[in-house]
Structures are given as structure tokens and as C-alpha cells.
């Protein structure tokens, strides 16, 4: 079932690129990121409330909170740079570069989480990087 969620994530990420490119025309990208963040904030808290997630907030550990905050900072910085790149570049070039994050995540998961680097993951990461380079050059 994870693949269905991943596929939906990919679909919405693709829509994000298109909607963002149209929405940031003539707009300060920092303001655009702030607006996007407010929408996500309301949506995420609404989902957490209606699905009962808020009732488990007391189970969060200090480590959970620290790393969720670090993840939020990384996400925010990613969005800021992504919107700026979309404002001045083509979606067909910006999106593939952004998706190189998959290859970077594989490497970081190996370094920090001890996830194995198999021939399959190395070849897949190199194909992602190669495909991205083909699309942008």
C-alpha cells in the first residue's frame, strides 16, 4: 500500500510545480512560500485533528520534537529555494533538479541511518542523476 501513497505524493508534487509556477508570476517568492505554508498549516492541523492525531501529542519525545523541527526547517528552506528557482527557471528544468533529492536522500540514509547501499540503489540513484542531467542540459 505504501506505493499508492508514494504515487499520490508524486502526483501532488507534480501539480505543486505547475500551480506554483503559475501562482508566483510577479509575486515575491518569500511571500508565496509564506502563503503556501499557511495553507499547509491549516490543512495539516485539520487532518491531525479529524483523524485523532492531536490526542497523541503527549507521546512525543524530545528527540521527536527536535527532529520534526529540523525537518520543518529543511522543508521551509527547500520550498524557498524551489519557488525562487521556479520563478526564474522552467518547470521542466527545475523539477528534475529538485528530484535529485531522491539520490541525495539515499546517500544521506546510508551515512546517517545505516541503510544499505545495494547495487540496485546505487544504479537507481545514478539513473536519477543521469536522467535529471539529460533533462536540464
Predicted regions and their residues:
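Structural signal for membrane-spanning alpha-helices in multi-pass inner-membrane proteins
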Residues: 20, 44-51, 82, 109, ...
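Helix-helix packing/entry segments at the starts of transmembrane helices
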Residues: 31-38, 86-105
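Hydrophobic transmembrane alpha-helices of multi-pass small-molecule transport proteins
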Residues: 120-136
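Hydrophobic/aromatic residues within transmembrane alpha-helices
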Residues: 23, 32, 85, 111-113
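C-terminal transmembrane-helix exit sites in multi-pass transporters
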Residues: 103-122
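Hydrophobic/small/kink-forming positions within alpha-helical transmembrane segments
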Residues: 10, 14, 18, 45, ...
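Juxtamembrane helix-loop-helix junctions in multi-pass membrane proteins
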Residues: 15-39, 57
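Membrane-interface interhelical linkers
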Residues: 1-11, 27, 41-67, 79-88, ...
Amino acid at each position: 500500500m505504501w506505493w499508492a501513497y508514494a504515487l499520490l505524493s508524486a502526483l501532488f508534487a507534480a501539480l505543486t510545480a505547475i500551480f506554483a509556477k503559475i501562482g508566483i508570476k510577479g509575486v515575491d517568492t518569500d511571500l508565496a512560500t509564506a502563503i503556501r505554508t499557511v495553507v499547509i498549516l491549516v490543512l495539516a492541523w485539520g487532518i491531525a485533528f479529524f483523524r485523532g492525531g492531536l490526542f497523541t501529542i503527549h507521546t512525543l519525545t524530545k528527540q521527536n520534537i527536535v527532529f520534526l523541527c529540523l525537518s520543518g526547517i529543511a522543508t521551509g528552506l527547500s520550498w524557498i529555494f524551489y519557488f525562487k528557482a521556479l520563478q526564474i527557471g522552467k518547470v521542466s528544468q527545475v523539477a528534475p533538479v529538485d528530484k535529485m533529492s531522491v539520490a541525495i536522500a539515499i546517500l544521506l540514509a546510508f551515512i546517517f541511518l545505516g541503510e544499505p547501499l545495494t547495487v540496485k540503489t546505487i544504479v537507481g540513484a545514478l539513473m536519477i542523476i543521469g536522467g535529471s542531467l539529460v533533462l536540464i542540459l
